[in-house]
Amino acid sequence: MSTEWNFKEQGTIDTDGGKIWFGAIGNQDSAKTPLIAIHGGPGMSHSYLYPLSDLADERLVIFYDQLDAGRSDRPNNSQNWNLPRFLRELDDLRKALDLHRVAIFGNSWGGTIAAAYASSNPKGLERLILSSPLLSTELWLADNQSHRDNLPSELISVMQRCEEESQEASQEYQDAVDVFY
């Protein structure tokens, strides 16, 4: 795996609320279906999905940053933080890049977007790959609580105290959260 992105094309695309950044890497002339990679967050960037660039030897791989993330505009408008807008963002990306057929990879929150997009039965979606998607907030909260309950009691105490005192930015809390993750 190379350590450089080597985008063949990158730019911004207009979408509801601002401009989103994209970068395309790989073989644009490949007969294999182009892959769109959707990052988690919301608020993270595409950069941690770098290992997917290994697929660029055989197909076009498109990375993008959702609005308010990475290299995209950051209007910081809570009206933008809704699933239908994120779905339109994905449609805008496909239209702007003229992607008639695609495979979609979604990780975490990106998996939520990808699953919702797939459920709308969009034309040309050939493959869907979900990695640790959030498909049920209720189940996610229960899983997180179960994981937290299994931490050492001293870490649970630190986290509870810091949360009650609104000290989530403290180093003590951050150290406890690092163990959680």
Residue ranges and their predicted role:
Residues 160-181:
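Alpha/beta-hydrolase
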Residues 100-143:
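Conserved hydrolase catalytic core segment
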Residues 2-19:
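N-terminal cap/lid segment of alpha/beta-hydrolase-fold proteins
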Residues 126-167:
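Flexible "cap/lid" loop of the alpha/beta hydrolase fold
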Residues 8, 85-92, 112, 116, ...:
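Alpha-helical elements of Rossmann-like donor-binding domains used by nucleotide-donor carbohydrate transfer enzymes
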Residues 14-75, 79:
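Conserved HGGG/HGGXW glycine-rich cap/lid loop of the alpha/beta-hydrolase fold
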Residues 62-109:
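Active-site loop/oxyanion-hole signature of alpha/beta-hydrolase fold enzymes
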Residues 30-33, 57, 81, 88, ...:
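Structured loop/turn residues at beta-strand edges in well-structured enzyme cores
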